[in-house]
Design a protein with these regions (language model features):
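C-terminal catalytic histidine-bearing segment of alpha/beta-hydrolase fold enzymes
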Residues: 250-298
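Short beta-strand/loop motif that positions the catalytic acidic residue
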Residues: 228-230
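Conserved alpha/beta-hydrolase "acid-adjacent" motif
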Residues: 235-241
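Primarily recognizes the serine-hydrolase "nucleophile elbow" in alpha/beta-hydrolase
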Residues: 140-223
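Serine-hydrolase catalytic machinery in alpha/beta-hydrolase-like enzymes
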Residues: 34-35, 41-60, 64-67, 74-83, ...
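Acidic beta-to-alpha connecting loop that harbors the catalytic carboxylate
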Residues: 232-235, 263-265
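Bacterial N-terminal signal peptides
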Residues: 10-19
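Bacterial N-terminal signal peptides that target proteins for export
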Residues: 1-11
Length: 298
């Protein structure tokens, strides 16, 4: 893998300056680069870009400057594959540890470049009661998901990433954002003034881990291949609904793999302490990536 070139270092430096507050940084690993999706300010969020994020335990909310936290693999292990990780949290907060940073580190250890997305929240728990939420899923969370895919592709050469193997992985509400980004696969604009807007926003694959709103996941022919996982004990729209999602992908002729774990419920994420079969879903995901040729066989 090539090291970061001066242009990339400059880009990162600008992004660091523009990320809102030291308090917000406290929740993120201190040794990881953090990149603002829009270094000059997020469209529609300009007036609130300097507000600090709200951090309660491992949950983050009050996000007005969407970012990617970067986990690059060791050069000797790099596969060229990249995954944007989208934590869940009911669109009110992001469960940034067990559905974000721990996943990013695991993927990097497997040779996969990972980027943990903090996106704008449609039901942000930092918004005062009785106040209209400033963001929506289909406008702002989607825009952040699309921008994240484009940003990673735009810097693929700098990070030795194959721009044809850039996927997304989402948990719960984050799975909704991933599925929506895949369904609203926006092409790039080769004439755009902003070079980040030139690549396609279509993820090459998607992994949906106990995603919500399963009834709204309607793939079309040519949709990105999908890896699905959930717990038998999850709520019905997920534990049963994900089986129907799998069938929709199959009927559309889109490669799909489904895992339902008998002993699991909702929100198992990635925890080192989870030694159950559900705790091994990341290994199953990596096997699927190899099988689909997004990750080379070692």
């Amino acid at each position: 893998m090539k090291s970061l070139r001066p242009a990339s270092l400059c880009f990162l430096a600008v992004a660091f300056v523009l990320i809102a507050s030291a308090r917000a940084q406290a929740a993120a690993p201190t040794d990881r680069p953090i990149i603002a999706l829009w270094p000059n300010g997020t469209p529609g969020s300009e007036a609130r870009r300097t507000e600090p994020e709200k951090i309660v335990g491992s949950n983050v909310s009050n996000i007005h400057q969407p970012t990617l936290t970067v986990y690059l693999p060791a050069p000797a292990r790099a596969t060229g594959c990249a995954i944007i990780v989208v934590p869940g949290g009911g669109h009110a907060r992001l469960a940034i540890e067990h559905e974000g940073y721990s996943v990013g580190q695991w993927l990097a250890d497997q040779g996969i470049a990972a980027f943990v997305l903090k996106h704008r929240l449609a039901k942000d728990d930092a918004t005062p009661a009785g106040t209209t939420q400033p963001y929506t899923i289909e406008r702002d969370a989607l825009a952040d998901g699309q921008r994240a895919v484009r940003l990673v592709r735009s810097l693929a050469a700098e990070w030795a990433i194959n721009p044809a193997t850039v996927g997304m992985l989402g948990f719960s509400a984050g799975g909704e954002v991933v599925a929506l980004t895949a369904m609203r696969a926006a092409p790039g604009d080769t004439t755009a003034a902003d070079p980040i807007d030139r690549p396609s926003a279509r993820p090459d694959f998607q992994a949906l881990i106990y995603p919500g709103r399963s009834g709204q996941i309607i793939p079309e022919k040519g949709a990105p291949p999908v890896f699905l996982a959930a717990g038998y004990g999850d709520r019905t729209d997920i534990s049963e609904g994900l089986a129907e999602v799998y069938l929709r992908f199959k009927r559309a002729g889109v490669p799909a793999e489904l895992h339902i774990y008998a002993g699991a419920g909702h929100g198992f994420g990635l925890r080192e302490s989870n030694k159950s079969p559900a705790g091994a879903w990341p290994t199953r995901l990596r096997e699927w990536l190899v099988d689909r040729k997004f990750v080379p066989t070692k």
